[in-house]
């Protein structure tokens, strides 16, 4: 098995969170949530939304590239590749409101994404049929979209 180069490892493992010995996918999603929370306190809310959207787009394409590189070294859809979980959890965070209950929405976004990612309902599992990095990324993107929808509905109902 050949050794992968540094940049695909850095991106694909979610800055190393994928090397967690326990639940690497959850570790990647947790790191992404922590990054988002830090940005929440550092940026004006509109800038946070634009930054989050940019992160989703950038890391989706970078994740496809990194996963393709890493699959050739580590095999198909390696558990250490968690950039997909990072992108997946950033998607529902786009629906988090800027109010005094924002942190409950962050917790809900994280939990809903992990549930959709693990259970893989409503076509999420079918996204894994795509080959290479696209298959690695797209199931988590769809899980993130479903989570986004539920967070948006919760915002509409709860406020």
Swiss-Prot record:
<keyword id="KW-1133">Transmembrane helix</keyword>
<dbReference type="GO" id="GO:0006665">
    <property type="term" value="P:sphingolipid metabolic process"/>
</dbReference>
<feature type="signal peptide">
    <location>
        <begin position="1"/>
        <end position="16"/>
    </location>
</feature>
<feature type="transmembrane region" description="Helical">
    <location>
        <begin position="104"/>
        <end position="124"/>
    </location>
</feature>
<dbReference type="InterPro" id="IPR026037">
    <property type="entry name" value="PgpA"/>
</dbReference>
<keyword id="KW-0732">Signal</keyword>
<dbReference type="GO" id="GO:0008962">
    <property type="term" value="F:phosphatidylglycerophosphatase activity"/>
</dbReference>
<dbReference type="GO" id="GO:0046488">
    <property type="term" value="P:phosphatidylinositol metabolic process"/>
</dbReference>
<dbReference type="GO" id="GO:0004438">
    <property type="term" value="F:phosphatidylinositol-3-phosphate phosphatase activity"/>
</dbReference>
<dbReference type="InterPro" id="IPR007686">
    <property type="entry name" value="YutG/PgpA"/>
</dbReference>
<dbReference type="Pfam" id="PF04608">
    <property type="entry name" value="PgpA"/>
</dbReference>
<comment type="function">
    <text>May be responsible for the conversion of phosphatidylinositol phosphate diacylglycerol (PIP-DAG) to phosphatidylinositol diacylglycerol (PI-DAG), making it a key enzyme in the inositol glycerophospholipid biosynthesis pathway.</text>
</comment>
<keyword id="KW-0378">Hydrolase</keyword>
<keyword id="KW-0472">Membrane</keyword>
<dbReference type="InterPro" id="IPR036681">
    <property type="entry name" value="PgpA-like_sf"/>
</dbReference>
<feature type="transmembrane region" description="Helical">
    <location>
        <begin position="54"/>
        <end position="74"/>
    </location>
</feature>
<keyword id="KW-0443">Lipid metabolism</keyword>
<dbReference type="GO" id="GO:0016020">
    <property type="term" value="C:membrane"/>
</dbReference>
<feature type="transmembrane region" description="Helical">
    <location>
        <begin position="134"/>
        <end position="154"/>
    </location>
</feature>
<protein>
    <recommendedName>
        <fullName>Putative phosphatidylinositol-3-phosphatase</fullName>
        <ecNumber>3.1.3.64</ecNumber>
    </recommendedName>
</protein>
<keyword id="KW-1208">Phospholipid metabolism</keyword>
<keyword id="KW-0812">Transmembrane</keyword>
<dbReference type="GO" id="GO:0016791">
    <property type="term" value="F:phosphatase activity"/>
</dbReference>
<feature type="transmembrane region" description="Helical">
    <location>
        <begin position="30"/>
        <end position="50"/>
    </location>
</feature>
């Amino acid at each position: 098995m050949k050794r992968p180069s540094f940049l695909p490892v850095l991106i694909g493992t979610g800055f190393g969170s994928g090397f967690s010995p326990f639940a690497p996918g959850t570790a990647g999603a947790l790191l992404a949530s922590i990054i988002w929370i830090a940005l929440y306190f550092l940026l004006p809310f509109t800038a946070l939304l634009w930054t989050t959207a940019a992160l989703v787009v950038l890391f989706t394409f970078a994740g496809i590239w990194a996963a393709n590189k890493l699959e050739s070294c580590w095999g198909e859809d390696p558990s250490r590749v968690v950039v997909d979980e990072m992108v997946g959890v950033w998607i529902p965070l786009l629906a988090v409101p800027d109010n005094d209950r924002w942190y409950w929405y962050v917790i809900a976004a994280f939990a809903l994404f992990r549930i959709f990612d693990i259970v893989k309902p409503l076509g999420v599992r079918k996204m894994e049929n795509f080959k290479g990095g696209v298959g690695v990324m797209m199931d988590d993107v769809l899980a993130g979209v479903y989570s986004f929808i539920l967070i948006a509905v919760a915002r509409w109902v709860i406020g």
